[in-house]
Amino acid sequence: MPASRLRDRAASSASGSTCGSMSQTHPVLESGLLASAGCSAPRGPRKGGPAPVDRKAKASAMPDSPAEVKTQPRSTPPSMPPPPPAASQGATRPPSFTPHTHREDGPATLPHGRFHGCLKWSMVCLLMNGSSHSPTAINGAPCTPNGFSNGPATSSTASLSTQHLPPACGARQLSKLKRFLTTLQQFGSDISPEIGERVRTLVLGLVNSTLTIEEFHSKLQEATNFPLRPFVIPFLKANLPLLQRELLHCARLAKQTPAQYLAQHEQLLLDASASSPIDSSELLLEVNENGKRRTPDRTKENGSDRDPLHPEHLSKRPCTLNPAQRYSPSNGPPQPTPPPHYRLEDIAMAHHFRDAYRHPDPRELRERHRPLVVPGSRQEEVIDHKLTEREWAEEWKHLNNLLNCIMDMVEKTRRSLTVLRRCQEADREELNHWARRYSDAEDTKKGPAPAAARPRSSSAGPEGPQLDVPREFLPRTLTGYVPEDIWRKAEEAVNEVKRQAMSELQKAVSDAERKAHELITTERAKMERALAEAKRQASEDALTVINQQEDSSESCWNCGRKASETCSGCNAARYCGSFCQHRDWEKHHHVCGQSLQGPTAVVADPVPGPPEAAHSLGPSLPVGAASPSEAGSAGPSRPGSPSPPGPLDTVPR
């Protein structure tokens, strides 16, 4: 586009209307491009006071401005000579411009807003300062596109920016676009290597013009499963033609096609170390803790759901949601909040261009927003997206080994549970077996078996299981999988059964012994009672006989016939004759012998009487015979009595 034509357009626009004034300060160049495309509604001068120093550009775009370069064919970039310097224009009076409302010059394809304001103001600077103004950044350093630093691309890019782009704007836009594409590719690589490769293919297709912006937008969202912010499509429409023109110019200098040049110099476009990439959370909508998409609050504040793919709906209201307001309390105090109608962080990380509203380091933002973008990753571990294929293979190998270890543990646990279940069934069968044996032993003891057979049968009961226990425990060979507690419990159960059987045996033996002792004691008591009864009966019979003899005073004590004589010693015993007296003397002398000493003491007594008879009877026992004179003298002493036993004692005994 010739410089004279640009001057004519600027003059005609300035004479048509005085809609707003533009300042020449550098913060205007920053704020114009860094505003969100979703907040690109046409605005007039701000009400309620003067606008901030770094927020001023609010005019519409000029016809045929560099912002509309996308309407030109991509294959034939315009080649124009550098415009001559305009010495007649002064820098003290800011020119005024009217919005572009005439459709005869061609439709304006970008929404009216800060994109056009920045580009138009850059064109004003170009018209006022001439072509001698070199593309510099705000701090005075030369502003060249990031990523192209060697070879003929550097000089060609610098010349392209000097000849066809606004000063301090075109190079910065190219740098922002490259950082944007680099951030997309790194975000895809953070998710997975496959998604990163797909995103890289989409980016190369977009730059090579094989994909339209809408197709790139839809396929990118389909590949990453994350919605992009509404400003992405207007940003690409505004800046992608600049990158394609630069690529075409560099390809012509290298005598190659754009596709060949991009294939050979792909690292210049997607070089992560050449520029600081944009935080992916600024390009993507936020997600909640469950990893699902969350509709932004700004799309539902007015009660209507708007499609993020249509920025014209979002341009009807100012954007008030700032990422600085989304910081959680755990991330520290938020940064100072810019005015609500600016979205300085929506397009790029341009913190080195701003002095009043400085943002944190991109690494800090990446670490803060990474749990929102990739919910599956750990917050304390930052994924290195510069891993090589070998490192990724190592990571996958480690993950595969981990999964194999987990599977082995699960398999071993399952086998252990199976073995434990089998052992539990075997223990249950064994306990049932012991219970049956114990019940059989109880039934046997309750039966009508004799007392002597009961200990024998009960003793044979526990001894049999004791011999069977080793045979029942021998078949178990899976001791490696059975814990010691199982065996210990089984042994305790067997020992408990043994102890109960032994206690029952001891109880049965003690009962038998007690009953035997009781039986012996009972028999002994019976014998003693029988003997005592016999003795008592004999003594009673003897006493009865004695009593009968004592009561019968007229019968002989020896033969029971009628007595005719009386013993001279006791005067109680009655005999029928001397023969019976001598026959009964063996028994009678025990009674009568005590009174024999009495007659011996009174032998000298001349008085005839019973002592004399006793004296005559007493000496007759030891001597064996009595004199007839003594017997004769004793006879008349007891008149009326039978003949004395003296003559009877003469009979040899």
Swiss-Prot record:
Induction conditions: Down-regulated by all-trans retinoic acid (ATRA).
Chain positions covered by the region annotation Mediates interaction with PDE7A (in isoform 2): 1-430
Positions marked as site (Breakpoint for translocation to form type-1 RUNX1-CBFA2T3 fusion protein): A51, P52
Result after altering E518K: In a colorectal cancer sample; somatic mutation
Nervy homology region 2 (NHR2): region residues: 394-412
Region annotation (Disordered) ranges: 1-109, 284-342, 434-472, 603-653
Binding residues for Zn(2+) 1: C556, C559, C576, C580
Sample GO molecular function, one term: zinc ion binding
Region ranges (Interaction with HIF1A): 176-268
Renumbered residue ranges of the record's region Required for nucleolar targeting (in isoform 1): 1-127
GO biological process, one term: negative regulation of DNA-templated transcription
Chain intervals for the UniProt region annotation (Mediates localization to the nucleus): 1-435
Domain TAFH: 171-266
Breakpoint for translocation to form type-2 RUNX1-CBFA2T3 fusion protein (site feature) positions: L127, M128
Region listing for Mediates interaction with PRKAR2A, in residue ranges: 485-506
Domain notes: Nervy homology region 2 (NHR2) mediates homo- and possibly heterotypic oligomerization by forming a four-helix bundle tetrameric structure.
Function, in words: Transcriptional corepressor which facilitates transcriptional repression via its association with DNA-binding transcription factors and recruitment of other corepressors and histone-modifying enzymes. Can repress the expression of MMP7 in a ZBTB33-dependent manner. Reduces the protein levels and stability of the transcriptinal regulator HIF1A; interacts with EGLN1 and promotes the HIF1A prolyl hydroxylation-dependent ubiquitination and proteasomal degradation pathway. Isoform 2 functions as an A-kinase-anchoring protein.
Disease in which the protein is involved: A chromosomal aberration involving CBFA2T3 is found in therapy-related myeloid malignancies. Translocation t(16;21)(q24;q22) that forms a RUNX1-CBFA2T3 fusion protein.
Record protein name field: Protein CBFA2T3
Protein species of origin: Homo sapiens (Human)
The encoding gene: CBFA2T3
